[in-house]
Amino acid sequence: MSHVSRRVFVRSTGLVASAVGLAPFFAKLTPARAKDSGLTLGKPAPFTFEALVARAQKAASAAYVPPARPAPEVVKKIDYEAHGKIRFKVDHALDGGGPGLYPATFFHLGQFFQKTVKMYSLRGGQAREISYSPSYFDMPADSIAKKLPKTSGFAGFRLHESNKRTDWKTQDWVAFLGASYFRTIGSLNQYGLSSRGLAVNTTAPGGEEFPDFTEFYLESPEKEGEPVVIYALLDGPSVSGAYRFACRRTTGVVMDIECAVFMRNDVAQLGISPLTSMFWFSEYDKQFRIDWRPEVHDSDGLAMWTGAGERLWRPLNNPTRVVTSSFVDKNPRGFGLLQRDRVFEHYLDGVNYDKRPSCWVEPVGEWGAGSVQLVEIPTDDEIHDNIVAFWVPEKAASKGASFRFKYRLHWQGDEPHPADNSARVYATRIGRGGEPGKPRPKNVTKFYVEFAGKPLEQLPKDAKVEAKISTSKGKISYVFTEPVPSTRRWRAQFDVTTDGPEPVELRAYLVSGKQTLSETWMYQLEPRG
C-alpha cells in the first residue's frame, strides 16, 4: 500500500468512527438470544487467552489466508457518505440490557473497511459468536449495502459508556475499526490520534503491510471499576498474533495490553505499539502553508522518557519527503504522541483540535534494546494521517521468531508521569536568521524555544540561565537566554547556519550552574533555501 493510499485509509477509520455499524459472521451453530438485545449468538465454546496465543503461533507456520471480502464490487461503492448513513440500531447493542456494564455496537462494511471481522461475546470463560444480520442496521431504502449477502459480516465495533447512564446510547469511548486500528476519546471526550496492534515495514522497501484483527472476544464487567477485556486475533501476510486489552474508563482511558507475536516471514521493520496521528502545520512552519487557521494538527510532538531517565521533546514536522528518525534506547520508560497546545485560539476550528487526546505508551517490564522510531510523511491537507511512532526491538523479526510485550496506553490530555523537577518545552518558534537592519542570509534560521515549569518559576531573580545547544552539522551563533516578558517562562534564542540541503539535528536544554532545568528539546531542521 502506498503512503498516499495508506494515509487516506487511516484517516477514514477516524472519520467513520463517529457513525454506527456492526460486526461478525453468521453463526452456523444453534442460535441463542443475547439478553434484551435481539442479537443471535452461537453455541458456547471454552475460551482462554493462552489458547488464542497457541492458535496464533500455529497460524504463523501455515500459509496466510486473508479475511473474507463479501461482494467486493458492492462494498467498494459504500463510500464515506454512504457508510455514514448506515447506522447500527443501538437497541441491539451487546450488553445494552446487561449483564455487562459497557454495551458494544458494531460497524458495517464499507469502502475503507472491506474485510470481515468475527465477533464473540465472552462470559464465564465461554465464547459465543455473534451472528451478523442486516436487520441490525438502519440504512436508506436505496443504499447500495442492501445488495450485500445476508451472511456478510461486520467491520469493527465500539464501546459505549456504562448502561447505568441515561445517555449511553449516544456516548461511546473506544472504537476498533480497520486493519488493527483503534482509538479512544481520552479525557477530553474527543477522538483524534489512533493506535494499532502492529506496524509492519512502515518505511521499508516494498511497501507497508497492514495485518488485521480478524476476531474479537468482548467481555464486559458486571461491577463498576473493573475493565472491559477484549481479546483479539491478528493475522497478516508476514505475521500473526494474539492480544489482550484491559480497557478502563477513568478520567480518560487506560488500556493494559499484552501481545504475543509470531513471524510468518522476515520483516525488516516491526513496530510495537504504533501510534498514528496528523500534523499539517503549527506556529513554527505556517509560512509554508496556505490556510486561515493558525495551526492544524492532532498532535504537536513526540515525548520520550528514556531508560536512562532523560526527558526528550521532539516537535513534529511536515517535511518535503518521508523522514524516519530513530532514537536508540534500552528499556524505555515511555514515549507518546502528545497534543500539548490546548489553547482554542491557536486553532480557531470547530473540530476541536485543542481537545484531541494524547497517547502515552508505558512499557511494562523490560523491553530490552531497540529504538523509538518517528516517521513523518509529507501532507498538504488535514485529511491525511502522516505521523507514525513506534518501538522497534533490536532483535531481528525473522521468520520463526516470536515476541511478547506488555504495555499500558494512557489516553488523556497530557503524559501521565510528568517530571516536576524539569521544565517542559512550551513553544518552538522559527524565523529568518541574522540581525535586524542587515541583509538576512538565506541559509540562516533563527529559533526561539520557550520553556515553562516549576524549576524556572522557582529561580531567584539573579539566576543565570544558560542554553546548552548542539547540532549535527552547521554552525550555532547568537545564543541568548532571557525570561519571556509578562510570563514565568524562559526562552533560548539562537541562529543555525546550514551549508547544504541535508537535514540538521538540533538539541537544546536549559541549565543554571550544575543544575539541569529542563527537558531536552530536539528538532530536525530541513533547509529550504
PLM feature spans:
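A contiguous, surface-exposed recognition patch within enzymatic or periplasmic domains that forms
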Residues: E81, V174-L177, G186, A268, ...
